[in-house]
């Protein structure tokens, strides 16, 4: 058989080859469509597990809503249980970065966990978005690869103290919170703003994070007109029950974790009257929150709180940043810049943006715990708009003072 090829057949074959070759040119775009790897550091055991479980639920609700896609890329999700301790957080962070090769990490939950991994995250140049509220990560020792879309430790406590002094007319308050960084920084923020408004902190009590019986501390609560508690996880439940059982009647104020919406199903009437300040509230009327509430009810049959909403919002930020960066995640410095430039108008908590340290600026809500139609609810009574981590203080002067600690500010005699 002749192997001669006619000119017409040659031209047709060449043209077909050219078309075939042309489809091979966009290889970088195809490579960039590789799965986007999203990691989560959370807590599934111990006293902080209440919040940690809701963190993962918030992520799962978002991913389901988006059909497991972000910016045109399929999402591979990796969840790690830190056990709620610094060593566990560091080990799991290293596994997510070095073994799983994640593009972005969400979490961890606790301030002491964040402090344990912040240097490693900066060295690994892996973007980290966290609810963990350790203040100096966005203040005196800023991490360029960190972003916080929820609140730093004292951010809710500044408006809470303002409200306690001006609206509740409290004058002499005793504070009580767990004996670790989040507790110190919450109470420090409350104390500074409360004292600036003419109030006085009589004493500060620091029970360990695992305290089955608060009786020795409750015995020290006397001769005041209010109490500020800063407990997290399931500890607010135990504290409020024991507080009422001890016959204490002083009004109690708290931050986002101490009066979380997710605890309402487990609180009893002893919590009625609890006043809290939070960057998220379930009674917020916006379309994003309505969708979020419906999805959480459908998938998990729960009322979401600060932890679930916070992780859902973090996912919104990741998606928006990835879109701003053209769907690319290989250059982590560019991705981080895109993430920090995000501002959102539609989230379950309302509009948010970030300051130049990577901490959120947004609305904070004062809620009063009430009983309506046989159910406990947090009813919003006041909104503080565009609250930053520096409250109304001058940023430069604020950063010149020490980070809030067990002893700063000191109790004045």
Please report, for each region that a protein language model flagged, where it lies by residue.
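N-terminal secretory signal peptides and thylakoid transit peptides that target proteins
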Residues: 1-18, 24-25
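Extracytoplasmic "Venus flytrap"
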Residues: 39-58, 62, 80-86, 109-110, ...
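Beta-alpha junction/loop-to-helix N-cap segments that form part of ligand/metal-binding clefts
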Residues: 50-55, 69-140, 207-214, 237
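Periplasmic-binding protein-like
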Residues: 96, 100-109, 129-131, 174-177, ...
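Extracellular/periplasmic ligand-binding modules, especially the Venus flytrap/periplasmic-binding
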Residues: 189, 233, 238, 283-342
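Solvent-exposed, acidic/polar segments of extracytosolic/periplasmic ligand-binding ectodomains
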Residues: 343, 347-413
């Amino acid at each position: 058989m002749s192997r001669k090829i006619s000119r017409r057949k040659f031209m047709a074959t060449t043209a077909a080859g050219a078309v075939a070759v042309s489809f091979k040119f966009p290889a970088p775009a195809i490579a960039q469509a590789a799965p986007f790897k999203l990691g989560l550091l959370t807590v599934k055991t111990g006293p902080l597990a209440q919040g940690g479980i809701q963190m993962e639920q918030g992520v799962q609700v978002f991913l389901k809503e988006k059909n497991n896609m972000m910016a045109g890329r399929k999402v591979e999700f990796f969840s790690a249980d830190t056990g709620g301790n610094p060593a566990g957080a560091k080990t799991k962070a290293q596994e997510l970065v070095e073994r799983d090769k994640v593009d972005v990490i969400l979490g961890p939950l606790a301030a002491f966990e964040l402090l344990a991994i912040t240097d490693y995250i900066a060295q690994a140049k892996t973007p980290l978005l966290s609810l963990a509220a350790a203040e100096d990560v966005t203040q005196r020792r800023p991490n360029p690869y960190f972003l916080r879309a929820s609140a730093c430790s004292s951010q809710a406590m500044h408006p809470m103290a303002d409200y306690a002094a001006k609206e509740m007319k409290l004058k002499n308050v005793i504070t009580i919170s767990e004996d670790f960084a989040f507790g110190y920084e919450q109470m420090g923020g409350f104390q500074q703003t409360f004292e600036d408004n003419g109030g006085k902190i009589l004493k500060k009590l620091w029970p360990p994070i695992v305290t089955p019986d608060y009786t020795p501390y409750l015995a020290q609560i006397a001769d005041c007109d209010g109490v500020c508690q800063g407990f997290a996880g399931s500890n607010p439940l135990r504290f409020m029950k024991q507080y009422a059982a001890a016959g204490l009647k002083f009004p109690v104020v708290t931050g986002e974790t101490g009066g979380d919406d997710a605890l309402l199903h487990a609180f009893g009437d002893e919590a009625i009257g609890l006043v809290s300040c939070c960057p998220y509230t379930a009674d917020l009327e916006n379309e994003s929150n309505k969708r979020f509430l419906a999805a959480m009810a459908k998938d998990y049959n729960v009322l979401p709180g600060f932890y679930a909403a916070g992780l859902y919002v973090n996912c919104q930020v990741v998606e928006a940043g990835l879109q701003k960066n053209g769907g690319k995640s290989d250059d982590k410095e560019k991705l981080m810049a895109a993430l920090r430039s995000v501002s959102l108008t539609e989230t379950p908590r309302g509009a948010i943006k970030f300051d130049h340290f990577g901490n959120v600026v947004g609305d904070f809500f004062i809620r009063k715990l009430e009983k309506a139609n046989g159910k406990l609810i947090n009813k919003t009574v006041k909104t503080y708009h565009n609250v930053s981590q520096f409250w109304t203080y001058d940023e430069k002067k604020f950063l010149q003072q020490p980070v809030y600690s067990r002893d700063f500010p000191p109790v004045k005699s």
